């Protein structure tokens, strides 16, 4: 028994019929197209994750710069009040 009650011989017969109907060149082309689509999808997902990470880093830098500016302003204010 193979997958779900289908024997290996039944799978081989189906494979032979598919090869006869479509031919090896067309199946090879379909396989290549499918592989290219999967590769493109993975690339798009990784690009999206990279863009999110860059946005988070930019936000962190912005917050750090704002905090530094606020600290500097507070320091200058204290110096002015001390005089």
Curated annotation (Swiss-Prot):
Keyword Iron: no
An annotated GO cellular component: TAT protein transport complex
Membrane-protein topology: Single-pass membrane protein
InterPro entries cross-referenced by the UniProt entry: TatA/B/E, TatA/E
Pfam families reported for this sequence: TatA_B_E (PF02416)
TM segment ranges: 2-22
Disulfide links within the chain: none
GO biological process, one term: protein transport by the Tat complex
Cell compartments where the protein resides: Cell inner membrane
UniProt-annotated stretches for the region Disordered: 50-83
Sorted UniProt keywords: Cell inner membrane, Cell membrane, Membrane, Protein transport, Translocation, Transmembrane, Transmembrane helix, Transport
Gene3D superfamilies reported in the protein's UniProt record: 1.20.5.3310
Biased composition, class Basic and acidic residues, residue ranges: 50-65, 74-83
Ligase in keyword set: no
Molecular function as annotated in GO: protein transmembrane transporter activity
Subunit structure of this chain's protein: The Tat system comprises two distinct complexes: a TatABC complex, containing multiple copies of TatA, TatB and TatC subunits, and a separate TatA complex, containing only TatA subunits. Substrates initially bind to the TatABC complex, which probably triggers association of the separate TatA complex to form the active translocon.
Family from the record: Belongs to the TatA/E family.
PANTHER family hit by this protein: SEC-INDEPENDENT PROTEIN TRANSLOCASE PROTEIN TATA
Alphabetized NCBIfam families for the sequence: PRK02958.1 (NF002813), tatAE (TIGR01411)
Purpose of the protein: Part of the twin-arginine translocation (Tat) system that transports large folded proteins containing a characteristic twin-arginine motif in their signal peptide across membranes. TatA could form the protein-conducting channel of the Tat system.
Protein name: Sec-independent protein translocase protein TatA
Organism field: Saccharophagus degradans (strain 2-40 / ATCC 43961 / DSM 17024)
